[in-house]
Amino acid sequence: MLISYRFKNFCSFAEEAEIDMMAPGNKVKHRFPDNYVKTEEGYDILKTAVVIGENAGGKTNFINSLSFLKSMFEDNKVKHSYRSLININNLQSECPAECETKQEFDISVIGESGTIYHYNLQIDEFCIVQESFSFKQSKTGKEKKIIYAKREHLKQIGDKPSSMAVEFEIKIDNCDKEIQTVFEQTAYNKGAMGLFVSKLAIVGDSHAIEFVNWMNDKLVVESKNYNYYLYKNIQNEEDDLRILKEDRFLEILRMVDYSICGIEIDDEKPFSMTKIIRKTKDGNILSRELRRDSGGVGEFFAWAVQIFRVVYENKMVFADEVDRVLNPILAERMIAFINGKDHKGQFVFSSHNVLHLDLKNYMKEQIYFVTKNRDTLDSELYSLADFPEIKYDTTKIYEFYMKGILGGTAFE
């Protein structure tokens, strides 16, 4: 489960931004017993959160930052920042040495074994600047550092700008001596420099393996700049097909239309040719291909796969721009479904729909805003919990938001 995630200097976010998935420590959480998971490690972790903001405010950049971090774990190629992903206000020159190109990503999670992992990565346009990885066994326990790597020297080799020699200060502890010996031999590297934690996993460190697997398999980031249903329509992933054929998937799908009583999956084109079967009040059976059904049904059909992964596979899903399908009524059904099941999955989604601003279904810690500074155009991420004057008996959150009192609305 995700405990917290923060990042800095990514796209429209110049300063540090953070999402914290811990439930509040006060009595408020007792009003929402289904909204969080009480872990054996001493944490109360939220199951859901919503991020609200205007168009072009930075919601997608927030989710894309996590997608970028996740992509770092896919291979062992050199890791560095890209100018197109650095905050524009930190790029005052074409010369990297005269710009602030360093980006930072920090994430804390609970692995499947119950071990708590804390990972920090700092990169610039050249390569890794600093990387650390530690673990502990409980919320109150002391973190034990496994690896700390800091760039000491960087110099160019030959005529190609991309040919760099890097020397790192590396400290390894709390792992096998054999692993430590291997890493001491990589302190000076002339080739590709992947993540140190990934290398730890490759050589067999159990903690690194668990964390890397969590980043690759448990974390799901869906951030598409076009219709999600159309995106899924051009894919044919076996894992999606497996989920679609589960009886429990139909239970989720029926939230969009309770007249749906069955589906006939098309193995070749499951997101377009699958037949949706409905039953009328009179008992008549109607069948229609998904591509000929309403856009809302098609869109929810695609997103229902991710909801399945949250509830039945304990995945951490970040979903961007689900407004086309999650109207307030359907969103309430979906959140109630996720909260009502016993699991360790999490669902965080972004939305323009201010009707999600509801303290009947959410704690203040579950509602986040993204707003943009009118002068610098920098984005900021913050929680409704940052407004102590907002009480749980407040019914005017929508009104406060529309007046700009809570931020997150477009400026003139």
Language-model features, listed with the residues they occupy:
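Short alpha-helix of the ABC ATPase nucleotide-binding domain corresponding to the H-loop/switch region
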Residues: N327-E332
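Pre-Walker A-like glycine/lysine-rich segment at the N-terminus of P-loop NTPase domains
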Residues: L2-F68
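Short N-terminal edge-element motif at the start of the domain
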Residues: D75-T101, V109-G114, I123-D124
